[in-house]
Amino acid sequence: MKGFPKALHTRRIYTGESLRYLRNPNAPESQATIPVASPDQALFEALIMERVMAGQGFLAHPLGVSHVRILADGQLAVHLDAPERDMRHGPLDETMAQHLLPCGEPGEWFCGVAGLRVVAVEGSSLTIGMAGTTARLILIAHTGWTKWLARKKKSAIALGELPLWEAPGITAGELESIPPQIRRLAWLGSGLLRRIALFHNVGNAYWVKGWTMGDHWKIEMFIHPDLDPGHDNFVDWLTLPPYGLSLQSEYRSCTCNRSVGHLRGCWQELTHRDDPQAGVLQLRFHMSDVGIRWGRRLADSGARSSWLSRTGLS
């Protein structure tokens, strides 16, 4: 780390970017802070983040993403975790990618990210975009995408569904499925995706899930009951200027001082510092012991022993 700018080292905690990438001339110290996405880009990233948080398998990192890279053009590269070693399904079926591709019956839409379109496939890189916009995102996997995409298309057609990720424009059903609240919360969802490594690098949560409801983006983090929940440290990093999100605490209910582990927990709500009407981030720190079996499955997915130890699963 000698000679490495402190600002870039701090950014790395949020994004998970490698030292090698941050030493690249395209990521100088002047770009150490995390840039804000354009409106279309932010909405697309928020829709992706909403699906990522809706469900995950046993993957090496919370939410199934090892790190993100913010590219020179302001777009995002998202590096996916590989699935468990003994999974019998296709190698991408158990990654977070399984939740993203939109499909539906003619005239309606029912699954995946509305408006997502495949733009380009190149080896292990899949470029996706939002129809009718310049928003782009690159998914980097552990294997190629071509066969998996062909299999997904064949499966959709066999079920009488349309592989909407190939459609030329966004359908009426997809447009109707994008609720007004996700548009208001786009800045928050995008900001969380661009800082997704915080869930692995800061705090003690072994499992993370989230969803949107009204003007709230809700995140639940599961923590071993024998550990310090570490919620203050997590919130401090999440809101640290200029790297974190522009959030301030509005409400807090904490029972972490109780002696019984499973009854301990914390509930916090944060709003935008400059615009409290821009939506609420609700953080729930939930104490729950899932046993050593979970630790073994996460280890089989490539989770590092140091992280498993920190989260109480080894």
Stretches with model-predicted labels:
Residues 2-30:
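Amphipathic alpha-helical packing elements
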Residues 13, 49, 53-57, 97, ...:
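Generic surface-pattern signal
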Residues 29-35, 85:
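Charged, low-complexity surface segments at secondary-structure and domain boundaries
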Residues 33-70, 90-91, 116-119, 125-314:
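Extended repeat-based interaction scaffolds and adjacent low-complexity, acidic/S/T/P-biased segments
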Residues 46, 72-98, 102, 216:
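Long, low-hydrophobicity ectodomains and other hydrophilic envelope-associated domains
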Residues 110, 115-116:
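Phosphate/adenylate-binding glycine loop and adjacent helical scaffold
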